[in-house]
Amino acid sequence: MQALMEMQIGASEVVQVLDTGCAVLPPESPLPMPEQSLRKGRLHVPRQRTAPLGIGLRRFYLIGGTMSMSLIATWVMLAVMWPGGINVLEGCLLVLFMFLFAWVTMSFASALAGFFCMVFGGGRKLGIDPQMPLPDLHTYTALLVPTYQEDPCRLLAGLQAIYESLSETGQLEHFEFFVLSDSRREEFGLAEEREYAALCERLGAHGRIFYRRRADNTGRKAGNIADWVRRFGGAYQQMLILDADSVMTGDTVVRLVAAMESNPDVGLIQSLPVVVGGRTLFARMQQFGACVYGPIIAYGVAWWHGAESNYWGHNAVIRTKAFADHAGLPALPGRKPFGGHVLSHDFVEAALIRRGGWATHMVPYLQGSYEEGPPTLTDLLIRDRRWCQGNLQHAKIVTAAGLHWISRMHMLIGIGHYFTAPMWGLLMLVGIAIPLVGDGIDLTAGMHFSPAHYWHGRTDGDVLWIFTFTMFVLLAPKLLAYFALLFKPYERRACGGALRVLLSILLESILAALMAPIVMYLQSRGVFEVLAGKDSGWDAQQRDDGKLSWSVLLRSYGGLSVLGVLIGALAYTVSPPLAMWMSPVVLGMAFSVPVVALTSHRLVGAVLRRWGIFLIPEETAPSKVLIRVAELRRARQP
């Protein structure tokens, strides 16, 4: 603290501003950031200069293909159910099937486009070519690191690695760094100030790295960024937003900023962060999935998003004036959870920037962007509860005046993601109910494994066709991702080779299937809690590998295990074939406690890593910046 107060900084360059605690900040350069209206507004520049050729055809393929495949599958399902008429429950089943099949089909269509982009080299845009020499910069960019009660040692280790990497590019003079704290607890504030002072001493970065802690953290992260824009944004043409666990190479940062400089009508460029640093089985499984499946998904959505891409809230560069002019978020009318400050602000900010006439792009092929994932399923679900509320809150924003229809689609997809969970649950419950009210169903029948057993006069062939096609659509993105990896020798070897990658995909699919019912149940509960008016609150995120005690596991998942046993028993009583078809869901629920315990264990993750399972290139051949982050964190550990 004393070192911070005694920093010798030229008064013409830096002044100390009291927010709370001790702040070290540059002279203020205010930039107006008016609050935007959701009732008034119009779409500026309906078609962007940087939009890909044929973007309309790409979107027609996605929507038309989704609708066509969904209608065909629904028609076949209707034909299966039609003989003898359809009762109310069967009608509900058909409607649920139609919507859920359309949901997975859209993901398949997008992944298929991503596969061809990856294999045949499409999708590069904005003049960003990682193989070309590093361009020279001519503007100033602020790297913003918002933090809320995070471990400052971990946080500033990442910041130091980015700083050093940018210094190696020879263009550090174009960047300044801001640690923007919203921490409320005094012990976190004091630790942040102490670590910040030590960082500046180590790097000799006085006058280039700044720190402040807000006295009033209104608006959470969005309010934190908005406060910086209004006070300091006028001095910087771009800002690069980082999360507390974000790391980026200097090369990647420079290329993103250069793309912004050379495309004056672009307001936002989102990179694809690679998930790294996982040690538990769950974290390593998640980062493997993000490594193998993530690119094909990202290439696909970038292909049809065009100049209307989304924003994930971090690891993205934003034109400061575009953000200030158009992304001032209003408070939503009404009480929480639907009213108040916008929680999932990133989607809305991207939509408003696009409404203001600026293009928003994603560049999934640019490597060197990293983040960390939650260590356990429990930590993911805690975070997911907040995302659930934020996405459902978009129901008040999706009809805002002047938004591009793709921006509205982003919000509807986010809302739909959470409503699919209770829809899957309803599909399961309706499946149990149909044999109960069916005419002539023999509940004592033997183990006849065909679902056609539930309806008289239905053929096994039609039902098998529906089942096979549904499973193909569900699993095809993973298969396409595997085939795409086979075309990339370096990545294939870095992931352990073709055989180990295939084994990893199989194990990941099994674990994901076991955890899917847990996620379905808790996401459904989250939806109902939001609809009932329960707010998610704002807690610090768990980033280190936290151990879960058996008492916590039983308290969190014991009820779900009992529910799974009861549903399985009921399904078997109704019809043994039904119980057999429902067994993946029932087993996942019934064994939720041991599944979460197993996947939360670091030892299991370490063993699988030694066996070459769930390997990613960032483990077998980490970049220099990741090696540096690990060194700095080890050095700062007590």
Curated annotation (Swiss-Prot):
<feature type="transmembrane region" description="Helical">
    <location>
        <begin position="499"/>
        <end position="521"/>
    </location>
</feature>
<keyword id="KW-1133">Transmembrane helix</keyword>
<comment type="function">
    <text>Involved in the biosynthesis of osmoregulated periplasmic glucans (OPGs).</text>
</comment>
<keyword id="KW-0328">Glycosyltransferase</keyword>
<keyword id="KW-0472">Membrane</keyword>
<keyword id="KW-0812">Transmembrane</keyword>
<keyword id="KW-0808">Transferase</keyword>
<dbReference type="Pfam" id="PF13632">
    <property type="entry name" value="Glyco_trans_2_3"/>
</dbReference>
<dbReference type="InterPro" id="IPR050321">
    <property type="entry name" value="Glycosyltr_2/OpgH_subfam"/>
</dbReference>
<dbReference type="GO" id="GO:0009250">
    <property type="term" value="P:glucan biosynthetic process"/>
</dbReference>
<dbReference type="GO" id="GO:0005886">
    <property type="term" value="C:plasma membrane"/>
</dbReference>
<dbReference type="GO" id="GO:0016758">
    <property type="term" value="F:hexosyltransferase activity"/>
</dbReference>
<feature type="transmembrane region" description="Helical">
    <location>
        <begin position="578"/>
        <end position="600"/>
    </location>
</feature>
<comment type="pathway">
    <text>Glycan metabolism; osmoregulated periplasmic glucan (OPG) biosynthesis.</text>
</comment>
<keyword id="KW-0997">Cell inner membrane</keyword>
<dbReference type="InterPro" id="IPR029044">
    <property type="entry name" value="Nucleotide-diphossugar_trans"/>
</dbReference>
<feature type="transmembrane region" description="Helical">
    <location>
        <begin position="94"/>
        <end position="116"/>
    </location>
</feature>
<dbReference type="InterPro" id="IPR001173">
    <property type="entry name" value="Glyco_trans_2-like"/>
</dbReference>
<keyword id="KW-1003">Cell membrane</keyword>
<feature type="transmembrane region" description="Helical">
    <location>
        <begin position="464"/>
        <end position="486"/>
    </location>
</feature>
<comment type="similarity">
    <text>Belongs to the glycosyltransferase 2 family. OpgH subfamily.</text>
</comment>
<dbReference type="InterPro" id="IPR023725">
    <property type="entry name" value="Glucans_biosynth_gluTrFase_H"/>
</dbReference>
<feature type="transmembrane region" description="Helical">
    <location>
        <begin position="415"/>
        <end position="437"/>
    </location>
</feature>
<protein>
    <recommendedName>
        <fullName>Glucans biosynthesis glucosyltransferase H</fullName>
        <ecNumber>2.4.1.-</ecNumber>
    </recommendedName>
</protein>
<feature type="transmembrane region" description="Helical">
    <location>
        <begin position="57"/>
        <end position="79"/>
    </location>
</feature>
